């Protein structure tokens, strides 16, 4: 037929049977990718250290989504929380991956069947004998079924009534686990960080979808609306479907990047705003202050800080620290975290405690500046030693570690002090293994960054697709030069402009 690549889909334009076939094949490809990707990730995933080497540090993309929905155990005998399991059953990571691959195979066979047997009676209009689809009726059916699925997910799966619940954690991503969630019907249900809103919104949206589906099944659209929105044209369906998809993609790009109850930091990593606002740093200092108020020593107070909380307060886990064309997981960047060295406290020779200014997100390099509790600069690592007034050597800065592997160790050697001051710019200090993965030391983004980038990009492309196909279906008569609703019989070749009696051709 010699169609250009951008017009190949016209082959299913007036062929409902094969239109169905290609959509089933598309579902087969999507499901097959999901199952295969899950098996690949499970093959390379190391579950041994859920605190310092969680799934998001390893660049896992589909495992977090399975975990979010309640899958925590593997046929390999491990659990995502770090424990061991003996009988994970069918609802394990491998079980779900296998189910997707089996479903993909069934869809593949169904697609072939529908491609071969395309001329089914159900697709032909009994009045005209031509292939046709009752699109408003199909819309009602799909809306009803989507409503049932949405309601069922919210009322049964999320609430634990018949299902596992979903992943729920505390605001600092320390105590996450899969648990049943009660619907939040008050104003708190609109807080994007309240898990109960997920249950209540799915129940409400599902109920609305069921009612709307029944409405569209029982009420036919008015003729003027039907014609005005071109409801008989399959390209109208394409245009509105693309609109639904790009809108959803923009929404999830937002909930992923800014964070929400649906994107827990234990599964997808922290957000950049938690670094920008010193979110974990404030919580760490609050806990240390409480410890000191309970008459604990500084060393004891810092030793009670969970390693998991300290690890979140490290710039290498900021998804905005990745870069264009920096492929690979976070572990391929700065390395695999092995242990927390402890919190360094810097002091000058007069005993003042000094704080290292932290590197802002979008800086690759940043001057090492130490300030006191009032924000006055007391020491730095100068660019020009000849003009320096606040160098570590001149001010006599020392460092002592509290908590972690170097608990109680202090250094006064200027070279060592400067080394730890530089590392303090990046948050809490961790020992990182770069040898195992041949990590290059350049920060990478987390799956949170990749997901956001992908969905925001495709949402933009699909937005233009919606405009394109919407314009094509609304203005088809203008583009073609033929009114699709023209009832009068048109004799081609009689007029210079088709159907325009004022342009009758002269008889030769």
From Swiss-Prot:
Q: In terms of one coarse class, where is the protein primarily found?
A: plastid
How is this protein situated with respect to the membrane? Answer: Multi-pass membrane protein
Instruction: Tell me which UniProt keywords the record has, alphabetically.
Output: Chlorophyll, Chloroplast, Chromophore, Membrane, Photosynthesis, Photosystem II, Plastid, Thylakoid, Transmembrane, Transmembrane helix
Cofactor binding description: Binds multiple chlorophylls. PSII binds additional chlorophylls, carotenoids and specific lipids.
Q: Which domain of life is it from?
A: Eukaryota
Task: List the Gene Ontology MF annotations in alphabetical order.
Answer: chlorophyll binding; electron transporter, transferring electrons within the cyclic electron transport pathway of photosynthesis activity
Q: Does the keyword Plastid apply?
A: yes
Mind telling me which Pfam families this protein's record contains? PSII
Gene3D superfamilies tied to this protein: Photosystem II CP47 reaction center protein
- Transmembrane annotation, as ranges: 21-36, 101-115, 140-156, 203-218, 237-252, 457-472
Entry's localization field:
Plastid, Chloroplast thylakoid membrane
Instruction: Name the GO cellular-component terms.
Output: chloroplast thylakoid membrane; photosystem II
Its GO biological process annotations read: photosynthetic electron transport in photosystem II
Cited function: One of the components of the core complex of photosystem II (PSII). It binds chlorophyll and helps catalyze the primary light-induced photochemical processes of PSII. PSII is a light-driven water:plastoquinone oxidoreductase, using light energy to abstract electrons from H(2)O, generating O(2) and a proton gradient subsequently used for ATP formation.
Q: Which family does it belong to?
A: Belongs to the PsbB/PsbC family. PsbB subfamily.
Tell me the subunit arrangement: PSII is composed of 1 copy each of membrane proteins PsbA, PsbB, PsbC, PsbD, PsbE, PsbF, PsbH, PsbI, PsbJ, PsbK, PsbL, PsbM, PsbT, PsbX, PsbY, PsbZ, Psb30/Ycf12, at least 3 peripheral proteins of the oxygen-evolving complex and a large number of cofactors. It forms dimeric complexes.
Q: PANTHER family, per this entry?
A: PHOTOSYSTEM II CP43 REACTION CENTER PROTEIN
Q: What is this protein called?
A: Photosystem II CP47 reaction center protein
Q: Which source organism does the UniProt entry give?
A: Agrostis stolonifera
Q: Which gene encodes it?
A: psbB
